[in-house]
Amino acid sequence: MVSIRPDEISQIIRDQIEQYEQDVKVSNVGTVLQVGDGIARVYGLDKVMAGELVEFADGTVGIAQNLEEDNVGAVLMGEGREIQEGSAVTATGRIAQVPVGDALVGRVVDGLGRPIDGKGEMKTTDSRLLESPAPGIIDRRSVYEPMQTGITAIDSMIPIGRGQRELIIGDRQTGKTAIAIDTIINQKGEDVICVYVAIGQKASTVAQVVGTLEEKGALDYTVIVAANASDPATLQYLAPYTGATIAEYFMYKGKATLVIYDDLSKQAQAYRQVSLLLRRPPGREAYPGDVFYLHSRLLERAAKLNDKLGGGSMTALPIIETQAGDVSAYIPTNVISITDGQIFLSSDLFNAGFRPAVNAGISVSRVGSAAQTKAIKKVAGKIKLELAQFAELEAFSQFASDLDKATQNQLARGQRLREILKQPQNSPRSLPEQVAAIYSGINGYLDDIPLEKAAKFIAGLLDYLNNSKPKFGEIIKTEKVLTDEAQTLLKEGITEYKQTFLVSA
């Protein structure tokens, strides 16, 4: 029989008492009262914050949105099919955060920054709050650098600057996404990080966009945030903030960034759905009262920072879909009033074959003219006025039978200018190409070219200049000004090519 000495027992007890660490965890726990339609009503979360993350028993995460007297309304960021009435809910004490860093570039992530492209985990070291305050007045500087879209109609008449918010608005199937994708493709070699946020779109459409960007080599500097139509409404309304947060990280590192929200109409609809399910009082068109703030706090995060903060910028191109051209609806008017201008796409122009279908008459860029390159400003100064006069004359000429020679010439010039502004999808033009195309139209070099051959002439001319007059392109790219030497080279190039074109035609 083993004999146990009392002093040994007391020593063991003493050691265990000394090693004992009191680890008390206080957690804020509640109970699910009701769950369904992506919303959970929770009782007992007394100390929860507005916007705090809460965790359900099955691992689903939600956000506390409605803090009422007797319960908390939480929106679910997952399916939540395993959540049962009476199950526990724990407040995490954290606000929603998004992983950020260089590892995101070239990846496709969901509405919370989690990878969904099947390329494995991302090694991100930093994270930022999903909702963060916009830069203040002192932190900003005015827009002065151009953000070239590569689309002649936009860069010449509705210029965009780095740090600007420019709305792209139009009916469905008018080429809104095409303009955004062309702008991303045109940033190749410009050291701009692009973020494309797809909200409530079909997965096949997003896959098509990814394929286009990959084919054009644009995925190397682009992050795609996709909250697809099949995702919960909560993720669809949070996705734009995720995109802004990712771009913000690069902006505060001193980089130029471009964010495209495609589109904010669907985000507003997702937010309306969530708000109505939370029983928030509906307002105009059944949207909640804070739907303006939903978009203003997002778009105000786009800015051009001052040099003390690194001089980074975030340019925002939000997209809004109108119904039958009605820009006076609630969401379109809200976003028009928040942004620094709008590019209006007309379904009539689109159906008539003028693509991109930019309606220059009602499109405007409020701050972009300060950022427009001098070369474009010099050659395109008159183009908007000429097109406006042409549109007026065209309407008048339908009723008048005999037109004088000057009017006929003006109509012919206007038709050719319109041809210059036509552009195929996914083929943005460089700055020298835009300068050459507009210069040849404004200065009458196309007047004696048959209208049906004008587009072919411009395409051939741009190729000829790139191959035979490379110095012209170099001067425009480096100087950003149409110097006398560049103008001489351009005139020579146009004259030489025109002779060969007319002979072959």
Curated annotation (Swiss-Prot):
It comes from the Bacteria. Keywords: ATP synthesis, ATP-binding, CF(1), Hydrogen ion transport, Ion transport, Membrane, Nucleotide-binding, Thylakoid, Translocase, Transport. GO terms for molecular function: ADP binding; ATP binding; proton-transporting ATP synthase activity, rotational mechanism. Its EC number is 7.1.2.2. GO terms for cellular component: plasma membrane-derived thylakoid membrane; proton-transporting ATP synthase complex. Belongs to the ATPase alpha/beta chains family. This is ATP synthase subunit alpha. It comes from Trichodesmium erythraeum (strain IMS101). The lineage of its organism: Bacteria, Bacillati, Cyanobacteriota, Cyanophyceae, Oscillatoriophycideae.
